[in-house]
């Protein structure tokens, strides 16, 4: 797994119309976010210490789910991009009422429409949370929301994640 570095830089690429993270001369992460979704378009914005710390918190949360390291890395880097996204209206009507949980940033939660899906809380307000969808989900209206989409919902639409944690993770 890659380790965050002060050498990493956020940039907006107009050719690709994407937010990118320059990792090295040979590696670059291309986010799924276009200019219309961004609040600002960075040029050589170094990765901050807070972002590096968030990277490790996100990775730690995602380790609760069984997934390959490459997928976990993609989710970590995509979640870090949320800092550059525009604020959005909530999409609570797409989801069933949940348990009104008090999830904090970087915790995993469950959203339920016609299907259920894991989501990573990116930011938290008194009555809303902004989440990154970890997989596709079918909403109550039948609309498909795609993996890696960032959505904002009322807290009463999320439920805490309940996983059976293997004994090796509890010692």
Question: Which residue ranges define each predicted feature?
Answer:
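Mixed-charge, low-complexity intrinsically disordered regions
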Residues: 1-105, 110-116, 138-143, 147, ...
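Surface loops and adjacent helix of pleckstrin homology
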Residues: 24, 134, 156
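Short beta-strand-centered aromatic/proline hotspots
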Residues: 116-132, 136
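Structured surface patches comprising rigid loops and adjacent beta-strands/short helices at the edges
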Residues: 148-163
């Amino acid at each position: 797994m890659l380790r965050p570095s002060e050498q990493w830089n956020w940039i907006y690429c107009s050719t690709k119309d994407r937010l990118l993270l320059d990792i090295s001369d040979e590696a670059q992460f291309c986010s799924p976010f276009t200019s219309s979704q961004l609040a600002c378009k960075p040029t050589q914005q170094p990765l901050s210490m807070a972002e590096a710390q968030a990277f490790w918190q996100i990775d730690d949360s995602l380790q609760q789910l069984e997934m390959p390291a490459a997928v976990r890395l993609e989710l970590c880097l995509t979640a870090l991009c949320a800092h550059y996204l525009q604020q959005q209206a909530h999409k609570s009507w797409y989801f069933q009422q949940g348990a009104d949980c008090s999830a904090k940033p970087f915790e995993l939660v469950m959203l339920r429409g016609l299907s259920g899906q894991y989501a990573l809380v990116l930011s938290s307000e008194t009555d809303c949370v902004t989440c990154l969808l970890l997989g596709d989900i079918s909403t109550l209206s039948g609309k498909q929301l795609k993996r890696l989409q960032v959505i904002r919902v009322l807290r009463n639409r999320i439920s805490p994640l309940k996983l059976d944690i293997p004994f090796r993770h509890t010692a």
